[in-house]
Amino acid sequence: YNKPFSYETFNGQIALITKDVYLKVGGYNSEITWGMDNENEELGRRIIKKHKLLLDPTFQVKHNFPGFNKLTKTYFYRVSSWMLVFMEDMKFESGGPAALDSGLAALSVPIFLLFLTIGLIFNSIFIILCFIFLIIWLNGYIKFFRYVLTNKPKFLVQSILLNLWFSSIISFGAIWGLLRWVIGHRVIKS
């Protein structure tokens, strides 16, 4: 992405919105249960019904990430909560980590590992399936890995290992969120 594009999540920490639009859509929803951590997604979905919401990739912010364990938990629960928003309208975001291609790439990692394990233990035919999911994963993240290789080549191996880890965590978070939705959890309690 080299220019602003339509997006679905209103990122309250760094976003701009006119007072008029904010009031028209009703602002943040106070009925969202505490701890869900998806008020930005829910507000964004209401904004895009009648207004344009853009993400400008030329804006950059500095991220201060917590430690590894905290980041792992945050990713898991964040994706789990996002799944409740997703199940409301079954729409992926147009870009970023909640886009369809990113989701498929992340989901392919645990499936790749599953087929690799089955192939090594039981039948090598599963190794073929393993490579299919490896290709899906690589296709989803190849631009990122090229960027790392160009800008921080010494970080490439760590970025691949971290991506494998966090893709798995994201996948398990999505599955957990789907299970929560199936048993009745919703973004807004009725």
What are these regions (language model features)?
Residues 1-20, 33-36, 61, 70, ...:
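A recurrent flexible, glycine/aromatic-enriched loop bordering the glycosyltransferase active site
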Residues 107-182:
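Membrane-embedded multi-pass helical conduit in multi-pass membrane proteins
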Residues 180-190:
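Short linear elements at protein peripheries
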